[in-house]
Amino acid sequence: MEETTSEVVEEYLLEIYILNQAGEKVKANKLATALNSKPSTVFATLQRMKRDDLVKLNRSKEITLTAKGSGLADNIAYRHNLAEYFLCNSLKIPWFEVHMHAHKLEHAMTPLVVEKLAEFLGQPQFCPHGTPMPGQSLP
C-alpha cells in the first residue's frame, strides 16, 4: 500500500527543498515566513515530520531533509515542474503565470498521471523557467 503525504506536509517539504536548493539554511522562523504560517503551527508540523523521519533538526535548530524527506521533496518538485511545463508548452499559458496553477495540480497528480504526462510531454529535462527537472541526470 502506498504511503500518502498530506498537502501541508508536501508544502513544507517543497519549501525546505527550495530553500536548500538556494543554499539557504532553513530554520523554523524562515519557514513560517515563507509559508505564511504561525511559528507554533510550523513547530508542531515539524515535530510530526521529525517523527515520520522526513526532517532532522540539529543543535542550532537548522532543518534538513532526511533521505526519505529528500526523496519525497524531489518527487513533489518534479510534479510541480512537470505541471508548469504542461501548462506553458501545451496549454500556452505564459511562463510567468503557471506557478500557482501548477501548485494546485502538483497535489492532485497520481504516479500514473505523472508517468503518462511525462511521456506525453517527451520527458522534459527543464521546467519553463529553465531549471533542470528534479531527479534528472543530465550530461
Task: Give short role names for the model-derived ranges.
Residues 50-58:
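A short, conserved structural fragment
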